From Swiss-Prot:
Single GO cellular component term: endoplasmic reticulum membrane
Signal peptide: 1-35
Subunit structure: Self-associates (via leucine-rich repeats), giving rise to homooligomers. Interacts with FGFR1. Interacts with FGFR2. Interacts (via extracellular domain) with ADGRL1/LPHN1. Interacts (via extracellular domain) with ADGRL3 (via olfactomedin-like domain). Interacts (via extracellular domain) with UNC5D (via the first Ig-like domain). Can also interact (via extracellular domain) with UNC5B, but with much lower affinity. Interacts (via extracellular domain) with FN1.
Taxonomy, superkingdom: Eukaryota
Gene name, Swiss-Prot/TrEMBL: Flrt2
Induction (record text): Up-regulated by FGF2.
Residue stretches spanning the membrane: 541-561
Organism: Mus musculus
Outcome following mutation: R186N: Abolishes homooligomerization and FLRT2-mediated cell-cell adhesion
Segments on the Cytoplasmic side according to the record's topology features: 562-660
Name the UniProt record assigns to this protein: Leucine-rich repeat transmembrane protein FLRT2
GO terms for biological process, alphabetical: axon guidance; basement membrane organization; cell adhesion involved in heart morphogenesis; fibroblast growth factor receptor signaling pathway; heart morphogenesis; positive regulation of synapse assembly; regulation of neuron migration
Pfam families: LRR_8, LRRCT
Function description: Functions in cell-cell adhesion, cell migration and axon guidance. Mediates cell-cell adhesion via its interactions with ADGRL3 and probably also other latrophilins that are expressed at the surface of adjacent cells. May play a role in the migration of cortical neurons during brain development via its interaction with UNC5D. Mediates axon growth cone collapse and plays a repulsive role in neuron guidance via its interaction with UNC5D, and possibly also other UNC-5 family members. Plays a role in fibroblast growth factor-mediated signaling cascades.
C-alpha cells in the first residue's frame, strides 16, 4: 500500500496570493478614506471648505465624511459635481452664504440636515427634493422664495422632512402640499396675507407653528384652518393685524399661545374655551380696553398671562378682573394689567383698584362733586340759608363714611375738603372745636399704612415742631387734639407701602386754621382787629419782607455817610494844595551851583496872582517865606532841612540857616 504525499508549496502559494489581494483592497480603501481635497482641511469626519472663495464643490470628497462645511463661498448652482451625490456618509451640509438662485441638485443622497439660508434661492423644484429622501431638517431662511417659485407638491417629495424653516422670504401664502410628518414650520417675516383651509389639512404631526411678522387679518384666515393641527403645542401669530384671536384653535395639546403686537380689540367669550392645557398666554401690545367676563374661566392649567401695553379702561366693566386677580392661585403669574384710563387711575394696577370709587353708570353711584376751597380756613359771614350750631368742646366727632366724603359747606369754614392731588387720595378736615381737628381720608388704591404729620405755622419761616402718627391702612380718620386756638396748622398725609406709587407723588397736604378760643368771644372789635393784625404780621413772607427792607435801609444809610465823609475830606485836602513842581534836595544843596527850581522868585515890587492848572500841581508841603538878603533885598525860599543853603538875589551863597 503506497503512502500519499501533499504538495504544500502549491497550497501555500494560493493562501499567500489570497492575503495579498485582501491587503491590497484594504489599503486602497484606507487610502481612499484618508484622501482630502487640497483646498480643504479634513479633521476626522469633518471637511472644512468654508470661506475659501470657492465657486464649486471640490472634487475628491472622501467616503466616511459626515459633516461638510461649504458656507460663505461663491458657489453657484453649476458647481455641484455628480459624484457628490454618491458620497453616502455625509449627513450634514452647510451651504449658507453662497450664490445659489435655485435649490441645488446632486447633493449627497443621505443628507439629513441641510443649511441653505442667506442665498438668493428663488425656485424650488420637485426633482431637487426628490433626491433627498432622508432629509429631516431644511433651512431656507433669508432667501427670495415666493409662492409661485415653489413647484406644487415640491416639499412633499421630501418624505422624511420634519423641520422646515422659510423665514424672511417673499411668500404671500403658506405653501400647499407640505410633508405629512412635518413637526415644525416657520414662515415668519414673509408677506403672507392668506392661509387657505388646505394649507395644514394633513399636518397632523405639526407641533410648532410660527407665522410672526406677516400681513394676516382675520378675513385672510379661512374658517377651520387650524382645527386640523391636533398635535400643535406652540402657536405664535405675533406682529400681524388680527382684530381678535383666530377661531377654532386646537386645544388638545396647545401649551403656548402668543398673540402680542396685533390690533386685537376684543376677545370672544369662547376664544379660549377649548384650551384647557394652555400654560402660557401673551396678549400684550394690542388695543384691549376691556375683557368679557369669564374669558379665562376655562384656562385651568394657565401658568403665565401677560397683558402689557393695552389701553385698559378701569371702569365698572373691569371690576370682575380685579376680583379675579385677587383670588387666582399662586402658581399663576399675571403681568401687565395697568389702568390707562380714566385719568384719575392712570398707571394704577388693576389688582389694587378700590372699586367703590369708580363711576358706574347703572349700578354704582358716582362720586360727589367737590368744590375747590382755599388753602386756609378763615371765618366768613354766615349764610342766611343755613343754620349750623356751634360745636362744643366736649362733642365727639362723628365717624366718616368710607364710601362718601363730606361736602363743602358755604358757611364759616367749619368743614372743608381739600381737592386731592390727581384725585388718588381725598382728604377732608372737620373742625370739632377750637383745639381739635378731625382728619378723614379716602384712597383709590390699597395702602398698608398712612403717616399723618402736622406742624404749627408760626412767625418762623420753618414752622414749629413736626408731629406725626402712623395709622394702619384700614383706618380712615384721625383726631388731632391739644391744638392751639386760632393757629394755622399744615397737615400732610403720606401713604406707606403703596403697591404702585412712590410716596412723594401721592403725598397730599393742606392748611387749616383753628377757631378762636370760646373764652374770648366777648372781646371788642378793636381787640379782634389787633389779633388779626398780629396774625397777619406773623406771616412768614411779610416777616421776610420786613427783614429785607431793614437790611437795605441800613446799607443805604452807611453808604450815604461814607460818601459825605469822603466829600468833606476832599474839600479839606484841596484847600491845602500849594505850588510845587517836584523839588529835589540836590537842586540847591551844592553851594549855589544849581538853582532850586522849586523856589518862586519875585524880584519886582508888585506881582499878580495867576491861576495855575490843577493838573500840574503835585502833592507836597509848600510855604511862602520872606528872605532878607545882606543887600537889603527880600527873597523867598522853601526850607526843608536845617542845613540847606539858600540862594539869594545877589548870587552870594549864605551858609546860615534859613530864617524869616
Amino acid at each position: 500500500m503506497g503512502l500519499q504525499t501533499t504538495k504544500w508549496p502549491g497550497r501555500g502559494a494560493f493562501i499567500l496570493k489570497f492575503w495579498l489581494i485582501i491587503s491590497l483592497g484594504l489599503y486602497l480603501q484606507v487610502s481612499k478614506l484618508l484622501a482630502c481635497p487640497s483646498v480643504c482641511r479634513c479633521d476626522r469626519n469633518f471637511v472644512y471648505c468654508n470661506e475659501r472663495s470657492l465657486t464649486s464643490v471640490p472634487l475628491g470628497i472622501p467616503e466616511g465624511v459626515t459633516v461638510l462645511y461649504l458656507h460663505n463661498n461663491q458657489i453657484n448652482n453649476a458647481g455641484f459635481p455628480a459624484e457628490l451625490h454618491n458620497v453616502q456618509s455625509v449627513h450634514t451640509v452647510y451651504l449658507y452664504g453662497n450664490q445659489l438662485d435655485e435649490f441645488p441638485m446632486n447633493l449627497p443622497k443621505n443628507v439629513r440636515v441641510l443649511h441653505l439660508q442667506e442665498n438668493n434661492i428663488q425656485t424650488i423644484s420637485r426633482a431637487a427634493l426628490a433626491q433627498l429622501l432622508k432629509l429631516e431638517e431644511l433651512h431656507l431662511d433669508d432667501n427670495s422664495i415666493s409662492t409661485v417659485g415653489v413647484e406644487d407638491g415640491a416639499f412633499r417629495e421630501a418624505i422624511s422632512l420634519k423641520l422646515l424653516f422659510l423665514s424672511k422670504n417673499h411668500l404671500s401664502s403658506v405653501p400647499v402640499g407640505l410633508p405629512v410628518d412635518l413637526q415644525e414650520l416657520r414662515v415668519d417675516e414673509n408677506r403672507i396675507a392668506v392661509i387657505s383651509d388646505m394649507a395644514f389639512q394633513n399636518l397632523t404631526s405639526l407641533e410648532r407653528l410660527i407665522v410672526d411678522g406677516n400681513l394676516l387679518t382675520n378675513k385672510g384666515i379661512a374658517e377651520g384652518t387650524f382645527s386640523h393641527l391636533t398635535k400643535l403645542k406652540e402657536f405664535s401669530i405675533v406682529r400681524n393685524s388680527l382684530s381678535h384671536p383666530p377661531p377654532d384653535l386646537p386645544g388638545t395639546h396647545l401649551i403656548r399661545l402668543y398673540l402680542q403686537d396685533n390690533q386685537i380689540n376684543h376677545i370672544p367669550l369662547t376664544a379660549f374655551a377649548n384650551l384647557r392645557k394652555l400654560e402660557r398666554l401673551d396678549i400684550s401690545n394690542n388695543q384691549l380696553r376691556m375683557l368679557t367676563q369669564g374669558v379665562f374661566d376655562h384656562l385651568s392649567n394657565l401658568k403665565q398671562l401677560t397683558a402689557r401695553n393695552n389701553p385698559w379702561f378701569c371702569d365698572c366693566s373691569i371690576k370682575w378682573v380685579t376680583e379675579w386677580l385677587k383670588y387666582i392661585p399662586s402658581s399663576l403669574n399675571v403681568r401687565g394689567f395697568m389702568c390707562q384710563g380714566p385719568e384719575q387711575v392712570r398707571g394704577m394696577a388693576v389688582r389694587e383698584l378700590n372699586m367703590n370709587l369708580l363711576s358706574c353708570p347703572t349700578t354704582t353711584p358716582g362720586l360727589p362733586v367737590f368744590t375747590p376751597a382755599p388753602s386756609t380756613v378763615s371765618p366768613t359771614t354766615q349764610s342766611p340759608t343755613l343754620s349750623v350750631p356751634s360745636p362744643s368742646r366736649g362733642s365727639v366727632p362723628p365717624a366718616p363714611t368710607p364710601s362718601k366724603l363730606p361736602t363743602i359747606p358755604d358757611w364759616d369754614g367749619r368743614e372743608r375738603v381739600t381737592p386731592p392731588i390727581s384725585e388718588r387720595i381725598q382728604l377732608s378736615i372737620h373742625f370739632v372745636n377750637d383745639t381739635s381737628i378731625q382728619v378723614s381720608w379716602l384712597s383709590l388704591f390699597t395702602v398698608m399704612a398712612y403717616k399723618l404729620t402736622w406742624v404749627k405755622m408760626g412767625h418762623s419761616l420753618v414752622g414749629g415742631i413736626v408731629q406725626e402718627r402712623i395709622v394702619s391702612g384700614e383706618k380712615q380718620h384721625l383726631s388731632l387734639v391739644n391744638l392751639e386756638p386760632r393757629s394755622t396748622y399744615r397737615i400732610c398725609l403720606v401713604p406707606l407701602d403703596a403697591f404702585n406709587y412712590r410716596t412723594v407723588e401721592d403725598t397730599i397736604c393742606s392748611e387749616a386754621t383753628t377757631h378762636a378760643s370760646y373764652l374770648n368771644n366777648g372781646s371788642n372789635t378793636a381787640s379782634s382787629h389787633e389779633q388779626t393784625t398780629s396774625h397777619s404780621m406773623g406771616s412768614p413772607f411779610l416777616l421776610a419782607g420786613l427783614i429785607g427792607g431793614a437790611v437795605i435801609f441800613v446799607l443805604v444809610v452807611l453808604l450815604s455817610v461814607f460818601c459825605w465823609h469822603m466829600h468833606k475830606k476832599g474839600r479839606y485836602t484841596s484847600q491845602k494844595w500849594k505850588y510845587n513842581r517836584g523839588r529835589r534836595k540836590d537842586d540847591y544843596c551844592e553851594a549855589g551851583t544849581k538853582k532850586d527850581n522849586s523856589i518862586l522868585e519875585m524880584t519886582e515890587t508888585s506881582f499878580q496872582i495867576v491861576s495855575l492848572n490843577n493838573d500840574q500841581l503835585l502833592k507836597g508841603d509848600f510855604r511862602l517865606q520872606p528872605i532878607y538878603t545882606p543887600n537889603g533885598g527880600i527873597n523867598y525860599t522853601d526850607c526843608h532841612i536845617p542845613n540847606n543853603m539858600r540862594y539869594c538875589n545877589s548870587s552870594v551863597p549864605d551858609l546860615e540857616h534859613c530864617h524869616t
